[in-house]
């Protein structure tokens, strides 16, 4: 075989391999959505300790805005929902390891996170909020981000709140937490001065816990979306279509007003 013939055969072989790889890629891309449909359920991760988004009520039932949103989402996808309560520190790792199909847990959409995960269109809009004990509000006088300088600030480990305060207020004394109950307990006993959480959660918490109050307007706008693994475009498209349907038929707004007495979905 001469060199030209050999080169031609190699080229044909390479093109065949590329075509096969492309077809395989298309098959894999749609595989997860089909797996979910075949199983008849979608595994969604949330904390279950983050009222009013997800929490256990007095009867022992898991409920909340994101619980009902997940149920409605699954219904639009034509499957049942399997809710798996998972601590925040490990919830995205559970998604990566395929123990979860999606995370619905106020995951803020950021450029850094978009490098690792795909996100649905936003389903809530909020901001970073400081929460303090009411009796210390005047003394702490937190009105803007710079006022956190020198303060003992509690944040969830690995959250956008941790990233934000370390970047924007390097003089803050940041303490990280794996769970919310410990964080709020430390606020009450004085181990920290303030907590940074989602504005919507802060307003709801302060409404129920009269010894706490929000200190100012939100420090920054943030949008939350459903986190999915990279490389599942058909699942992402199906999720976005479901969200658009829930927005159009008023379901999202209805759930928002039920838990927040306002439309926080846009």
Predicted region positions:
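Short loop->beta-strand "edge-of-pocket" segments that line small-molecule binding or catalytic clefts
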Residues: 40-46, 143-158, 173
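Ligand-binding cleft/hinge of the Venus flytrap
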Residues: 56-58, 70-79, 145, 158-177, ...
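Acidic, polar ligand-binding/catalytic clefts
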Residues: 71, 75, 80-147, 213, ...
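Periplasmic-binding protein-like
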Residues: 125-132, 199, 203-244, 260-266
């Amino acid at each position: 075989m001469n060199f030209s013939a050999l080169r031609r055969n190699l080229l044909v072989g390479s093109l065949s391999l590329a075509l096969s790889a492309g077809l395989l890629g298309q098959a894999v891309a749609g595989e997860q959505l089909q797996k979910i449909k075949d199983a008849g359920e979608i595994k969604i991760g949330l904390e279950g300790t983050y009222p009013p988004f997800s929490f256990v009520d007095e009867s022992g039932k898991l409920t909340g805005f994101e619980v009902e949103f997940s149920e409605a989402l699954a219904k639009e996808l034509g499957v049942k929902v399997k809710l798996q309560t998972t601590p925040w520190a490990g919830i995205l790792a559970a998604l990566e390891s395929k123990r979860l199909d999606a995370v619905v847990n106020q995951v803020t959409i950021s450029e850094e996170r978009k490098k690792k995960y795909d996100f649905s269109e936003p389903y809530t809009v909020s901001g970073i909020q400081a929460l303090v004990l009411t009796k210390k509000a005047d003394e702490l006088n937190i009105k803007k981000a710079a006022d956190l300088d020198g303060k003992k600030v509690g944040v969830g480990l690995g959250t956008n709140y941790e990233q934000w305060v370390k970047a924007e207020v390097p003089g803050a004394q940041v303490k990280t937490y794996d769970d919310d109950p410990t964080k709020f307990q430390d606020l009450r006993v004085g181990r920290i001065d303030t907590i940074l959480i989602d504005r919507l959660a802060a307003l709801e918490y302060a409404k129920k816990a009269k010894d706490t109050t929000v200190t100012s307007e939100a420090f920054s706008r943030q949008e939350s979306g459903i986190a999915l693994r990279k490389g599942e475009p058909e699942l992402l498209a199906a999720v976005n279509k479901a969200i658009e349907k829930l927005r159009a038929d008023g379901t999202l707004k209805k759930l928002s007003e039920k838990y927040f007495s306002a439309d926080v979905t846009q």
